[in-house]
UniProtKB/Swiss-Prot annotation:
The keyword Transferase does not apply. This protein is involved in the repair of mismatches in DNA. It is required for dam-dependent methyl-directed DNA mismatch repair. May act as a 'molecular matchmaker', a protein that promotes the formation of a stable complex between two or more DNA-binding proteins in an ATP-dependent manner without itself being part of a final effector complex. This is DNA mismatch repair protein MutL. Belongs to the DNA mismatch repair MutL/HexB family. GO terms for cellular component: mismatch repair complex. It comes from the Bacteria. It comes from Vibrio vulnificus (strain CMCP6). GO terms for biological process: mismatch repair. InterPro entries: DNA_mismatch_repair_CS, DNA_mismatch_repair_MutL, DNA_mismatch_S5_2-like, HATPase_C_sf, MutL/Mlh/PMS, MutL/Mlh/Pms-like, MutL_C, MutL_C_dimsub.
Length: 664
């Protein structure tokens, strides 16, 4: 058989088989063109499920007369020009195949007028002939594309179209996905002359939630958690639902990469893995998630319909999504939190007797239910739509009540501001050189009221502001107490029944990490690596890994032996996921080999956990008040009644007696 170059019209029809699968495929390509043109309003008219008519009208930038015919040619586009453009695609379309493919299997009319032209022009082409006819017409600034009699010249393709109702349902679902990707664009959908959907442009959070409710339903909105995270150039934001919002089918799963609709296996696996302990096998998560990253780090030129992408750092993307969602779900209010004793943000419900000369303690008494609301406040993330509710909690500017009923001077303005910002819905940033920190609680109406009551105190004369040390100040401290202020950027001043004390935040970081790594009580949960790490080691290190394999497993570190000089790291606990495992694991095995004969290593895992904590704990040069509160709160939850209060490098009492004497 002779090899020949295919005629252009035949090549276009073959390409149409990839691009134009059904009427919904046509709508997708044309609406994406409208979005790329900068349109803020798109009207879509459908007749007979799209088989008879598809009309897309927008108010975008338009096409000049001289380029109308070229726009209907194959591989003609204004979106990329060089190979560098192909490697950093931000537009939705880029191949230049859609209009040519659609026009080869339909009767297509392209009408457009840019702002630089007074006259609009229309280009018409039909089927295999591919001859473009231009004529002047009336049209506002923007573009209209009419696709009539889809597959009229390919009866076999037309025969495989489903019923009118089914084909329109595909178009409707497609536009739901598009509506969630561009909240600032108004979209109207008509079928057989009747308005079916009307998505008004959303310019604020409230309007965005209305569109979200329109697309996903009120049940989704009631159970949703708002996610906003950023790490190493990756950004993740959107909404997920708590396990209570799980569905029996996967009909509310929307994911976007750089604004592009995706059905990517890597992303789906990360999301499923984050829900694996929360959902039953027959349940499906519901979510609307947006992933943003450097366009050079993702290849969208993989699938003809652009439904899949290839990430250059697949493991990083997978683990980032998994960690973000798993942490959010673990700390949502749908999961019972550990009982919190006296802590940096918890206030005793029982009123103390006020010393003589101060205002009565009952003036600040708060019902037990109020404290319960604060105690059970979830740690992350913020419920969407509660930004407005947080505004009344401004009395932090005034002083707040100590447990003796006396006022304590407020923290400096910059620290109060940082504390308030940490409770706002701003993006929670995780940098590569510090441990992952979770956001603050998402208060309900009851919780907001509780905070307002706790933080509000009457305006008493300044002479009542005192901080009396207890006569038994030399006795051991029994609690970390309530946070007052950060001192010298590295220490936290707190108050307890015994008086005031300073906590070393660097030392607290170490103990927090140690608490996360200590598997004496219960084995730590191992988080599998997307790509297992293969290490070539000395024979003695591999032997140490085999000898202490059970101990490493209790700490969440899973090995798979390959041979006597190589092994694979299959999983690590959460505190180690962001570490350089290629350096850390060999050092850990060297430590285990050198300490194998010591009794402390043979009896428990504490020594190994301490060794790891010293190397993993990320100590900062300065801390904000919100960061300090987060550290000691997690420290109390991890250690509970076994707080290392005997460590003088962690906490020490502060006696203000001499200072107070100078002021009296």
């Amino acid at each position: 058989m002779t090899i020949r170059i295919l005629p252009a019209r035949l090549a276009n029809q073959i390409a149409a088989g990839e691009v134009v699968e059904r009427p919904a495929s046509v709508v997708k390509e044309l609406v994406e063109n409208s979005l790329d043109s900068g349109a803020t309003k798109i009207d879509i008219d459908i007749e007979k499920g799209g088989a008879k008519l598809i009309r897309i009208r927008d108010n975008g930038s338009g096409i000049v007369k001289d380029e109308l015919g070229l726009a209907l040619s194959r591989h003609a586009t204004s979106k990329i020009h060089t190979l560098d453009d192909l490697e950093a695609i931000m537009s939705l379309g880029f191949r230049g195949e859609a209009l040519a493919s659609i026009s080869s299997v339909s009767r297509l009319t392209l009408t457009s007028r840019p702002a630089t032209q007074e006259q609009a022009w229309s280009a018409y082409t039909e089927g295999r002939d591919m001859q473009v006819k231009l004529q002047p017409t009336a049209h506002p600034i923007g573009t209209t594309v009419e696709v009539v009699d889809l597959f009229f010249n390919t009866p076999a393709r037309r025969k495989f179209l489903r019923t009118e109702k089914t084909e329109f349902a595909h178009i409707d679902e497609l536009l739901k996905r598009i509506a969630l990707s561009c909240f600032d664009v108004s979209i109207t959908l008509r079928h057989n002359g009747k308005v079916i959907r009307q998505y008004r442009a959303a310019h604020n959070d409230l309007q965005a939630e209305k569109r979200l409710a329109t697309v996903c339903g009120q049940a989704f909105v009631r159970c949703m958690l708002k996610i906003e995270l950023e790490h190493q150039g990756l950004k993740l934001h959107g909404w997920i639902t708590t396990p209570e919002g799980a569905r029996q089918q996967s009909d509310l799963q929307y994911c976007y990469v750089n604004g592009r609709m995706m059905r990517d296996k890597l992303i789906n696996h990360a999301i499923r893995q984050s829900y694996e302990t929360s959902l039953k096998p027959e349940q499906f998560a519901a979510y609307v998630l947006f992933i943003e990253l450097d366009p050079h780090q993702v290849d969208v030129n993989v699938h003809p319909a652009k439904h899949e992408v290839r990430f250059h750092q697949a493991r990083l993307v997978h683990d980032f999504i998994y960690q973000a969602l798993a942490s959010a779900l673990a700390q949502s209010d749908s999961i019972e939190q550990p009982q919190i004793n006296e802590s940096a943000f918890h206030y005793q419900a029982e009123p103390e007797v006020a010393p003589q000369g101060s205002f009565p303690a009952e003036s600040n008494e708060v019902p037990q239910a109020v404290y319960h609301a604060i105690e059970k406040a979830p740690a992350y993330p913020r419920k969407a739509g509660q930004e407005q509710q947080l505004q009344p909690v401004a009395p932090l500017e005034s002083s707040f009540s100590s447990e003796q009923g006396r006022e304590v001077s407020p923290a400096p303005h910059n620290e109060r501001k940082a504390w308030m910002e940490s409770r706002s819905p701003a993006r929670h940033t995780t940098s590569s050189n510090q441990s992952e920190r979770y956001g603050e609680p998402a208060p309900s109406k009851q919780q907001v009221k509780a905070y307002a009551e706790l933080l509000h105190t009457p305006d008493f004369p300044s002479q009542n502001v005192e901080c009396h040390p207890s006569p038994s100040i030399a006795s051991p401290v029994q609690e970390l107490g309530k946070a007052v202020s950060v001192v010298a950027q590295r220490y936290l001043l707190t108050t307890t029944k015994a008086g005031c004390q300073l906590i070393s935040l660097a030392r607290a970081e170490f103990y927090r990490t140690l608490g996360q790594l200590n598997g004496d009580k219960a084995p730590l949960k191992s988080q599998p690596l997307l790509v297992p790490l293969s290490l070539k080691l000395e024979k003695g290190l591999v032997h140490a890994a085999q000898e202490h394999q059970d101990r490493f497993a209790r700490m969440g570190i899973l090995f798979k032996m390959r041979n006597e000089k190589a092994l694979m790291v299959m999983g690590v606990p959460a505190p180690l996921r962001q570490q350089n495992l290629q350096l850390l694991i060999p050092d850990l095995l060297s430590y285990a080999a050198s300490q194998a004969q010591k009794e402390e290593l043979a009896q428990n895992d504490t020594a190994m956990a301490q060794w790891l904590a010293l190397r993993v704990a990320k100590v900062k040069s300065h801390y904000t008040l919100s960061e300090a509160i987060q550290i000691i709160s997690e420290l109390e939850q991890l250690w509970q009644e076994k707080l290392p209060l005997q460590d003088s490098q962690l906490v020490t009492s502060v006696d203000f007696s001499a200072t107070i004497a100078q002021l009296t």
